[in-house]
């Protein structure tokens, strides 16, 4: 079997660090490694190409830009290139589009169209891409290539609301074509990541790339699991060879959704399966992430990376064989049986901590915004409901039903028990104090308890709401108890930091090696505290909007979360004027929508916010209707007789994203 290229993917997502690369170059001598990809601070304004350019040709952007930060990035990347090249490793830098420094829209207003959306096929954007590439190679001339991503950026490249004006596949071809041609001129490698948060992302990106067959040669890099590194997801159906292009598979070893290197997470069995899937797809290059937020696999459970290396080297070796090899080499005989048991316990414990019945609990930052975005509150709904309405959320297993609050609490109790069991076993074994397991299992005892407190508070919210207790006595008591537990776990009073809400992608600047208190306790304590305000707001909205209705939904409320169809990052919910609300769209997902099914009445009523716009688009049973709130934020539509259920979809109409409170039907 032909051996694929092996790339280590580094610094996810942390500042450029030459000393770290020096360390990895030494480690690479123990394995076959051909090249490096560098993520860097990709979720910040200073990631990718933008962090290497001072924009001095554009006065407003130049004035807003941190020139010292840019100079430091240039110096660090040039050092990294020198270190890597001396070891014979090529370096490919991650970049996202569309990213803009503050002020650049004043310098180049032509970047936006008449609808206030990004002009994705205009000359101004094409010139800007060429400018970014030219300036990058002026400052880092030895860079070997670029890895481009078209999602999770300041502006959407594939989700604009007018697909006739900006057909996604043509937009992708337009952008890729510029990158490919400019890099070909310079003799550099171009790699296109097909990563997306919904199936439509993959379809559009792959179609746009494949349309360039015969005109350009580049590589398509696709994740080994669809969307993100979730062990409960199936094989990625988009991991396929496109005619005329090479294929790379992006893999992961630390556990982005499994503790990010802060929890024990041996998963050799899964890794061997991923390698075999990639080999079956004809992958030319395996890209393996070896760190997360400053936690490197070689300081942790290196067995995971060893599993990739051995599975790629030997197509007959099994997970059991790899484990046996590693254990015999690296687990001292007096600890071996115990370490093997800890590996087994860690897998189950982590899965029961960071997932609810197989659904990802935390996306991005641990905050209320992403719990609402990720369909998490839908899992706590009373009774048995299908999760089919979570079809726009990549991490939801839509064939399942809501597990029930009792089952969720039981799952978290078991996670705590497993963490306690693991730490007790480690204490009994008593390996040297510098063994990495000490930190991971001590973390596990804290994290499992913190997550359990969050789940207890959410469950109390739903219990009180279901019982109609407006003063939420169970929730208040549980929040008080949970905050006390957070303080106990921290050893002092936990600081609760309020996060600024962004309707779109926030720039994450501090991603490096945060403490468990900062990473877990502080944000989870904040969420628990916010639940009381959420309860009061939802109760107020129900009293204000729903009396006398035939059927009604509080669009941004937690209790009705399971009834709202939306894309993961497209229609964020927040409290506004003391009421739960939800936007339809943002500049990352201008085509964002809110879709619901209501029992039919003879009138449909929509309530919303009029501060920024009264206009929106209503799609009622497939019929598009330009709609507008009255001065009180109310819109009504007479419904004809028809099927028992009416489907309602809300979208933007114009430049401004509309914000909604409630949708209901009445018989009048």
Kindly label every feature range from the protein language model:
Residues 79-116:
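Substrate-binding cleft and catalytic face of glycoside hydrolase catalytic domains
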């Amino acid at each position: 079997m032909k051996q694929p290229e092996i790339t280590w993917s580094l610094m996810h997502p942390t500042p450029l660090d030459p000393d770290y690369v020096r360390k990895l170059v030494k480690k690479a001598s123990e394995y076959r490694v051909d090249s490096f990809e560098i993520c860097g601070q990709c979720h910040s304004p200073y990631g990718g190409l933008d962090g290497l350019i001072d924009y001095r040709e554009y006065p407003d952007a130049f004035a807003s830009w941190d020139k010292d930060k840019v100079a430091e990035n240039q110096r660090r990347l040039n050092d990294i290139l020198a270190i890597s090249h001396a070891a014979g490793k090529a370096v490919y830098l991650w970049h996202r589009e569309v990213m803009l420094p503050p002020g650049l829209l004043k310098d180049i207003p032509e970047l936006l169209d008449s609808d206030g959306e990004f002009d994705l096929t205009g000359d101004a954007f094409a010139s800007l891409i060429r400018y970014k590439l030219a300036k990058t190679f002026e400052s880092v001339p030895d860079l070997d290539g670029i890895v481009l991503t078209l999602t999770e950026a300041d502006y959407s490249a594939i989700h604009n609301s007018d697909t006739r004006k900006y057909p996604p596949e043509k937009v992708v071809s337009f952008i890729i074509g510029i990158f490919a041609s400019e890099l070909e001129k310079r003799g550099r490698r171009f790699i296109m990541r097909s990563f997306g948060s919904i199936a439509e992302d993959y379809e559009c990106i792959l179609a746009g790339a494949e349309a360039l067959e015969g005109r350009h040669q580049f590589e398509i890099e696709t994740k080994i699991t669809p969307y993100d590194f979730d062990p409960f997801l199936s094989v990625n159906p988009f991991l396929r060879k496109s005619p005329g292009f090479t294929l790379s598979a992006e893999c992961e070893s630390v556990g982005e959704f499994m503790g990010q290197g802060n929890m024990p997470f041996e998963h050799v069995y899964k890794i061997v399966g991923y390698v075999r899937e990639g080999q079956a797809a004809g992958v030319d290059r395996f890209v393996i992430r070896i760190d997360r937020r400053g936690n490197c696999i070689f300081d942790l459970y290196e067995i995971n990376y060893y599993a990739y290396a051995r599975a790629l080297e030997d197509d007959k070796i099994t997970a059991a064989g790899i484990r046996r090899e590693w254990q015999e080499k690296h687990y001292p005989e007096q600890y071996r049986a115990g370490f093997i048991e800890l590996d087994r316990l860690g897998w189950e414990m982590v899965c029961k901590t960071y997932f609810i019945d197989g659904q990802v609990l935390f996306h991005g930052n641990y905050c209320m915004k992403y719990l609402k975005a990720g369909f998490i509150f839908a899992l706590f709904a009373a009774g048995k409901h299908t999760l089919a309405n979570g079809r726009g959320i990549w991490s939801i297993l839509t064939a399942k039903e809501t597990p029930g609050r009792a089952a969720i609490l039981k799952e978290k109790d078991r996670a705590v028990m497993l963490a306690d069991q693991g730490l007790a076993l480690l204490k009994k074994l008593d390996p040297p104090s510098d063994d990495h397991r000490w930190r991971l299992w001590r973390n596990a005892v804290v994290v499992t308890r913190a997550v359990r407190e969050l789940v207890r508070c959410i469950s109390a919210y739903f219990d009180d709401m279901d019982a109609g207790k407006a003063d939420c006595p169970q929730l208040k008591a549980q929040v008080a108890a949970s905050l006390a537990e957070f303080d106990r776990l921290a050893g002092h009073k936990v600081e609760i930091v309020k996060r600024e809400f962004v309707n779109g992608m926030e720039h994450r600047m501090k991603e490096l090696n945060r403490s468990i208190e900062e990473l877990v306790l502080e944000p989870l304590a904040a969420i628990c505290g916010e639940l009381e305000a959420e309860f009061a707001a939802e109760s107020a909205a129900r009293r204000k909007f729903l009396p006398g209705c035939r059927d009604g939904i509080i669009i941004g409320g937690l209790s009705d979360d399971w009834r709202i169809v939306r894309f993961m990052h497209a229609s964020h919910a927040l409290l506004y004027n003391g009421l739960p609300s939800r936007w339809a769209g943002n500049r990352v997902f201008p085509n964002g929508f809110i879709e619901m099914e209501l029992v039919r009445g003879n009138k449909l009523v929509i309530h919303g916010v009029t501060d920024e716009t009264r206009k929106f688009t209503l799609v009622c049973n497939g019929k598009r209707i330009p709609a507008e709130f009255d001065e009180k934020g109310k819109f009504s539509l007479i419904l004809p007789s028809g099927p028992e259920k009416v489907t309602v979809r809300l979208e933007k109409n114009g430049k401004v994203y509309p914000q909604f409170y409630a949708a209901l039907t009445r018989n009048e």
